[in-house]
Amino acid sequence: MGTSYNIQFEAEIPEDKVQKGIDSLFYLLNKSLSTYLPQSDISKINRGDSTVVVDHHFRAVFEKATEVWKASGGYFDPTVGALVNAYGFGPETYVNIATSDQLDSLLKLTGWQKVKLRKDGTVHKEFPSIYIDFNALAKGYVVDQLGVFL
């Protein structure tokens, strides 16, 4: 997820078994939610793959994102990923935004209301170029899941 971590714990079972469980959990969560892994579900969706069936982790973060988006009156918006990348803060290539037309074209790709999670577990985006970025929520979700695991 584009970051490092340090976990300290005490356990009555061997540390290597706990570490294997942590590694497995992080693998699953990264495979679902990391924009820094090209083969993660969210990266595939961001490239326009509408056939990806998301797992329960993606669904949980999607639902929380919707809740926060509504509570904030739209100020929290996971579709700002294209802007995040354009200004050099994300995993994708930096784009120099030189004109207001370029900025306007990216702004058209924002708006959480343009993204839907279908009952079949696939994600529908009004425009295939919409870039979803859950990083504001995903890291906290990972910590919560780690707490459940431990």
Name these PLM-found stretches:
Residues 1-135, 148:
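A contiguous, well-ordered beta/alpha segment that forms the leading edge of an enzyme domain
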Residues 136-150:
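Cysteine-centered nucleophilic/redox motifs
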